[in-house]
Amino acid sequence: MQTWTDVIGSEKEQDYFKATLATVRSEREAGKVIYPPATDVFNAFKLTELDQVKVVILGQDPYHGPNQAHGLCFSVLPGVRTPPSLVNIYKEMQRDLPGFVTPSHGFLESWAKQGVLLLNTVLTVQAGQAHSHAHLGWETFTDRVIEQINASCQGVVFLLWGAHAQKKGRFIDRQRHHVLSAPHPSPLSAHRGFIGCGHFSETNRLLSQQGMSPINWHSVCE
């Protein structure tokens, strides 16, 4: 099976992706503040290798405030206030998972190390400007990532929250994989069905049904 190094390496040969990376690099060199830091842009792939992927959570673009984004969707670095969407994710977990205690942090690396790919569809953003890198080619790259998971893996649970993620998931083979959809956990839409979706217990039910070990979602509480 290919590794993420193979997949990302072959994309780096493509003209569209060369242009994406060159634009981000030139913006950094021009003194613009770009999140996450260059060393963290591909963190999701460093922490969750392709052959380890069991669950994919799709975000949009990185947080655009200081010290928040570190390459995992919805996650922030330790010591940074938990953002509103993640507050709602925790709220649903507390409702859905017996014994889940809302953590005081928003650092989700422990999920990534268990096979949860925390993937934003756009991997960089300019400070203070949401969606500023939405049309640089990142979307094409993350389409390729999803295609690779779709083709290489079996029985992955995709959690698609909000219209953007659901549109992105239209190519997923639902005979090979599981797709759970809900409104986005942002304060604007969480009450429309994200709270009550039960996706975390359902993910573990689907994994166990296939003989795969469930995700210890409680690892963030420890």
Swiss-Prot record:
PROSITE patterns: U_DNA_GLYCOSYLASE
Catalysis performed (reactions): Hydrolyzes single-stranded DNA or mismatched double-stranded DNA and polynucleotides, releasing free uracil
First-listed, main subcellular location of the protein, grouped into a coarse class: cytoplasm
UniProt entry tagged with the keyword rRNA processing: no
GO molecular function, one term: uracil DNA N-glycosylase activity
GO biological process, one term: base-excision repair, AP site formation via deaminated base removal
Keywords: Cytoplasm, DNA damage, DNA repair, Hydrolase
Enzyme Commission designation: 3.2.2.27
Active site: D61 (proton acceptor)
NCBIfam families membership: PRK05254.1-1, PRK05254.1-2, PRK05254.1-4, PRK05254.1-5, ung
The family this protein is said to belong to: Belongs to the uracil-DNA glycosylase (UDG) superfamily. UNG family.
Name the record gives this protein: Uracil-DNA glycosylase
The organism's taxonomic lineage, starting at the top: Bacteria, Pseudomonadati, Pseudomonadota, Gammaproteobacteria, Aeromonadales
